[in-house]
Amino acid sequence: AATRFAHAASDQNDAIAGMIRVTASRAFASFLLPDTFADFSKSQPEIKVDLVVTDETVNLLMREADIAVGMFRPTQQVNLISKKIGELELAAFAAIDYLARRGTPRSLTDLQGHDIIGQDAQGGPQEELRAMGVPIGPNFFRFNCDDQTVTWQMIVAGCGIGLGHLRLGMSDPRVQRVLPEIPIIKVPVWLTAQAELNANVRLKTVFDFLSNSLSGKLA
């Protein structure tokens, strides 16, 4: 593990060429980072990126990565610099063919007659939905999934209704937003880097690019 997560940023703070290690959750890396890094490779051909995709916490203080993209601001701010770059908007979606088979729900109570895909996690979107009046009970979910990427694939496949990234869903012709009266759930997204951010040219170049690019894809 120590070898896998060796600190990537060079000690030569003024050198643009070299490696930067970026960590992100599987869902964030799958949905938002490929296009971002495609653009990055065109503008910064000398910088290599090691993308660490994990839903586990990566310790920047222990130099396991140079930059982290995540839904939580690190609680230990010593020797780290964090910036809120936007909010990830979540809304309810279902596949077009699923709605053709089962009908489109017109109210929150209609959800009880549908197959709902839940996220197997404490708190988070499910608690917010319950607070909005969504009738979440013991038998509310037909499916539970602990992976947001797979959850989205299940929605697209027609397994049922579930939460997905608003911008992604609105641009996908295979799905349709349902119950738009349910308020959009907004999850803050943070970009965090080592404290030497402003002194390391390569680190700052990647950080600034991610900040500018991802903020345009978030709310």
Predicted regions and their residues:
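C-terminal regulatory
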Residues: 60-62, 74-189, 216-219
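A late-sequence structural motif
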Residues: 181-219
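Generic recognition of short, well-ordered alpha-helical segments
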Residues: 32-35, 63, 80, 103, ...
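Alpha-helical linker/hinge and terminal dimerization helices associated
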Residues: 1-13
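Central regulatory/effector-binding core of bacterial HTH transcription factors
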Residues: 17-77
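Short loop or secondary-structure boundary microenvironments that flank
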Residues: 26, 168, 193-196
